[in-house]
Amino acid sequence: MKLKKLLFASAMSLAACGILQAQNTQVIAHRGFWKTDGSAQNSIAALVKADSIHCYGSEFDVWLTADNKLIVDHDGVFKGVRMETSTEKECTSITLDNGENLPTLQQYLDKAKGLKTRLILELKAHKTPERETLAVEQIVKMIKDMGLEKRTEYITFSR
């Protein structure tokens, strides 16, 4: 009888832990909610759509251009343009699949400011540690200046 009570108590404890854990699970829209009409990866529309379905966060990728400007894009080379060796103007002239131009980080954050979803900012791995450090300094300053520190989380796969 004691064994049954112990097993029952253990099972109930595990079930309660599972319920509590499920309540803490959050959804992050990877590159925004982009697999929808009128959206594209890392687009401002994808950010807005992630917010509209109440995602905990919307992940997006940031690069530093050759002229030291911050842009939002996943790939190091997109539509033939290499992010790190091209200017902001060259990068932002790229048209995304939904018709938007590739956004600057400033444009992306300007839109995010009026939304509720958290910002999951991925700094892409750059060619040198110096470039990454410069990108980090600019990103942190921009986030702070816009008052978005409490809504922003950072990730990177930098070496």
Indicate where each model-derived feature is located.
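N-terminal secretory signal peptides that target proteins for export/translocation
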Residues: M1-K2
